[in-house]
Every structure is written in C-alpha cells, then in structure tokens.
Regions:
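GST-like domain detector, emphasizing the conserved glutathione-binding G-site
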Residues: 4-136, 154
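Charged catalytic carboxylate motif
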Residues: 22, 99, 141-144, 174
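Surface-exposed helix-capping loop/turn segments at secondary-structure junctions
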Residues: 86, 151-164
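GST superfamily/GST-like fold recognition
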Residues: 114-118, 162-174
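Amphipathic alpha-helical packing segments from all-alpha helical-bundle domains
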Residues: 135-155
Length: 174
C-alpha cells in the first residue's frame, strides 16, 4: 500500500461486526492499509453524536477517504474495486460478475441480517421473543440461505479453490 493510503483512509468499525469483517477482508486482499477507528457497539458508541456526525445511519463500517465518508459495506467494496482495480475481486465477464454479486447478495441480504445485533435486539425487546424462539428463527433462515449458497456453488463449473474460480472474489469477502 502507498503511504498516502495510510494517512487518508480511516475505517470506523467494530471487531465483531460481520459488515466490518468483510470490509477489512477486502482492504487486506487489495493490499490497502487504513487507520482503524474502533466503534464499540456494546457501549453504544455508534449512537453517540460523535459517530452520528461521521455516519448519520449510525452503523459500521464507515470509510473516510480524504475527508469524505463512504457507508454501507457493499458500496464501499464496489468503490474499492473501482478505485483499486487490482487485484480484482470481480471476474471480467458480465455474466460471471453477476453470479459473484448474487452470491455476495445472498449472504449480505438473506443470511447476515438475520443474525444482526440490532435485529436480534428488536426481537428481544420489541417483540418479547425468548432466546429459544430467536435461535429457532435464526437457524431456519440462515440454514435456508446457506443451503441456497451451497447449491449455487455445486452447480458452478468455475468453482475451484474459492467460491468462484482460483482467486478470492466479492463472494468470498462476504
């Protein structure tokens, strides 16, 4: 990574956040270094005015680059791919890119949100769900998501060492 990357990129993240993990993985695969700024969700640091000024959505991760803040891990990963194209995290063909994006979306939209901290807190506090009900609910939807992911992998002749080919893609990042 260039020295300027270290000074100009600041990643607001939480060490146990899946969306923060995917962004750290993408940054690592791209060979980019960034300043890490911890946002402790356990102490509700993301709800404080200081972080709200960074990201009005009050979610991690957020990536500050040259004073501008990018939010939402899918958008940030796309930005990384566009601004730092090598190594590529998307294949070259349009059909292959769509397949990789579909795998990533399956995790990002159908699996990960089910086990998201704020969703689980809503189930507990607003709906009064007990842990057994929450665990059953999570297991049902997460299993369905991973079953679909595995079926897509099994049907893909390009599957190799990674989800799609011989090098990591956005699908593996998620």
């Amino acid at each position: 990574a260039q020295q300027s990357d270290i000074r100009t990129m600041k990643l607001y993240n939480f060490f146990r956040s899946g969306t923060s993990h995917r962004l750290r993985i993408a940054l690592y695969l791209k060979g980019l270094q960034t300043q890490y700024v911890p946002v402790d969700l356990r102490t509700e640091a993301h709800l404080k005015d200081e972080f709200k000024a960074v990201n009005p959505q009050m979610l991690v991760p957020a990536l500050e680059v040259d004073g501008k803040v990018l939010i939402q891990s899918p958008a940030i990963i796309e930005w990384l791919e566009e601004t730092h194209p090598t190594p590529a995290l998307l294949p070259t063909g349009a059909n292959e890119r769509a397949q990789v994006r579909a795998l990533a979306a399956l995790v990002g939209c159908d699996i990960h949100p089910i086990n998201n901290r704020r969703i689980l807190e809503y189930l507990r506090k607003q709906l009064g769900a007990d842990e057994a009900a929450i665990n059953t609910w999570c297991a049902t939807w997460i299993t369905a998501g991973f079953d679909a992911y595995e079926a897509l992998l099994a049907a893909n002749p390009l599957r190799s060492r990674f989800s799609f080919g011989d090098s990591p893609t956005v699908a593996d990042v998620y």
